[in-house]
């Protein structure tokens, strides 16, 4: 008799994806972040659902409804802070996951990689709209500044901004539609994640050495299910430490002031996970140029497979490229720091230099280092 997990139509899909899936035997802890992203998504959907039961998307009551959740709803405070800090954990896992892909050459699976870039944009859009919902000062001014960037688009810009706002400024219509989009987008993300997995399972996972591993594969369960559970426990530990000991560590104090269109905060800045892109945006004096640089800061990931010049897929045995990769990490940390600083000397210059370096690493230095390493192989 055939095992039910191998014969039942639904169980068969789960079996082929999570149980009998042939997996390279040498994948490291860097491959844990995919499953952790799935866990983060589930946490966000569940906590978000419970928050939506008590939240009201009206400019007059949005701020009060969030306060009500924290003060009066049973365990509302923990749900709210798990959702807010869960977003930070989501982005930490996302950056680690993308970084792993760049380091080990996972971008060679172009379909999986491009769906991943689309996922990243969608997650960023969802997080941005979620930040607007509490209707604090930074929510309001963040929404105003970021949506206003679309006015840089020639000819249709102004009309587009007013269309998104639903009026002549960020107001009730904007908040209501942002709530609607923020609610529906995680389900779209879930669908895209399923497509992402579908494409990945067509080719099989990459591994640290970057070479074909068909001759040496092991079943996903129990080896990697156990490994993923360890990652999950560590993720929940860090999240709960954050939620229970310093829930406002990554937030902005200005967001505890109700939105006031007549009073601009001294420093308008987004959440920490957008600061690198925000720094790139601010480093260009021209508005349209800044918006293009902002979009390209993520879209440049799509160009990486086209600029791969090395004969080796992974950076595991490529010391020059490794140095460039860690330079990129340091550069991103610098950009994140600059994004949170006021627009004044010397931060402007540092931001411009870091932005130039960011694009140079991807477009010039990495392809050149690949060519040099190919030459070194012949020595």
UniProtKB/Swiss-Prot annotation:
InterPro entries in the cross-refs: Cyt_b/b6_C, Cyt_b/b6_C_sf, Cyt_b/b6_N, Cytb/b6-like_sf, Cytochrome_b, Cytochrome_b_C_euk/bac, Cytochrome_b_N_euk/bac, Di-haem_cyt_TM
Binding-site positions, a ubiquinone: 201
An individual GO BP term: mitochondrial electron transport, ubiquinol to cytochrome c
Protein name: Cytochrome b
Note: Heme 1 (or BL or b562) is low-potential and absorbs at about 562 nm, and heme 2 (or BH or b566) is high-potential and absorbs at about 566 nm.
Subunit structure and binding partners: The cytochrome bc1 complex contains 11 subunits: 3 respiratory subunits (MT-CYB, CYC1 and UQCRFS1), 2 core proteins (UQCRC1 and UQCRC2) and 6 low-molecular weight proteins (UQCRH/QCR6, UQCRB/QCR7, UQCRQ/QCR8, UQCR10/QCR9, UQCR11/QCR10 and a cleavage product of UQCRFS1). This cytochrome bc1 complex then forms a dimer.
Recorded superkingdom: Eukaryota
Keywords carried by this UniProt record: Electron transport, Heme, Iron, Membrane, Metal-binding, Mitochondrion, Mitochondrion inner membrane, Respiratory chain, Transmembrane, Transmembrane helix, Transport, Ubiquinone
Cofactor: heme b
Similarity comment: family membership: Belongs to the cytochrome b family.
Protein species of origin: Genetta genetta (Small-spotted genet)
Entry GO CC: mitochondrial inner membrane; respiratory chain complex III
Function: Component of the ubiquinol-cytochrome c reductase complex (complex III or cytochrome b-c1 complex) that is part of the mitochondrial respiratory chain. The b-c1 complex mediates electron transfer from ubiquinol to cytochrome c. Contributes to the generation of a proton gradient across the mitochondrial membrane that is then used for ATP synthesis.
Transmembrane segments: 33-53, 77-98, 113-133, 178-198, 226-246, 288-308, 320-340, 347-367
Residues binding heme b b562, per UniProt: 83, 182
Membrane topology: Multi-pass membrane protein
Cell compartments where the protein resides: Mitochondrion inner membrane
Annotated heme b b566 binding sites: 97, 196
Gene3D superfamilies, per database record: Cytochrome Bc1 Complex, Chain C
One GO MF term: ubiquinol-cytochrome-c reductase activity
Cofactor note: Binds 2 heme b groups non-covalently.
Keyword Metal-binding found: yes
């Amino acid at each position: 008799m055939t095992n039910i997990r191998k014969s039942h139509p639904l169980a068969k899909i789960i079996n082929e994806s999570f149980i009998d899936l042939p997996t390279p035997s040498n994948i490291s802890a860097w491959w844990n972040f995919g499953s952790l992203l799935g866990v983060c998504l589930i946490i966000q959907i569940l906590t978000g659902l419970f928050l939506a039961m008590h939240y009201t998307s009206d400019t007059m009551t949005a701020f009060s409804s969030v306060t009500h959740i924290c003060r009066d709803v049973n365990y509302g405070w923990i749900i709210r802070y798990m959702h807010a800090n869960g977003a930070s954990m989501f982005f930490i896992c996302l950056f680690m996951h993308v970084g792993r892909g760049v380091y080990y050459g996972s971008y060679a699976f172009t379909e999986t990689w491009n769906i991943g870039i689309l996922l990243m944009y969608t997650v960023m859009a969802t997080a941005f709209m979620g930040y607007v919902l509490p209707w604090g000062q930074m929510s309001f001014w963040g929404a105003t500044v970021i949506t206003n960037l679309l006015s840089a688009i020639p000819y249709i810009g102004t009309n587009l901004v007013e269309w998104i706002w639903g009026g002549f400024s960020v107001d009730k219509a904007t908040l209501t539609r942002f709530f609607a989009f923020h609610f529906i987008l995680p389900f779209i993300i879930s669908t895209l994640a399923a497509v992402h997995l579908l494409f990945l399972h067509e080719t099989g996972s990459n591994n640290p050495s970057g070479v074909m591993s068909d001759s040496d594969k092991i079943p996903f369960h129990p080896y990697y299910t156990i490994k993923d559970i360890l990652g999950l426990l560590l993720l929940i530990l860090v999240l709960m430490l954050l939620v229970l000991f310093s829930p406002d560590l990554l937030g902005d104090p200005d967001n505890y002031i109700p939105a006031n269109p007549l009073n601009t905060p001294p420093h308008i800045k987004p959440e920490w996970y957008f600061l690198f892109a925000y720094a790139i945006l601010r480093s260009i004096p021209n508005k349209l140029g800044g918006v293009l640089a902002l979009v390209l800061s993520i879209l440049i990931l799509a160009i990486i497979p086209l600029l791969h010049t090395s004969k080796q897929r992974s950076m595991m045995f490529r010391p020059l490229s490794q140095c460039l990769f860690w330079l990129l990490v340091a550069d991103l940390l610098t950009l994140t720091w600059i994004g949170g600083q006021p627009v004044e000397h010397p931060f402007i210059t540092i931001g411009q230099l870091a932005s130039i370096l960011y694009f140079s690493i991807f477009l010039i230095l990495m392809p050149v280092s690949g060519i040099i390493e190919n030459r070194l192989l012949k020595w």
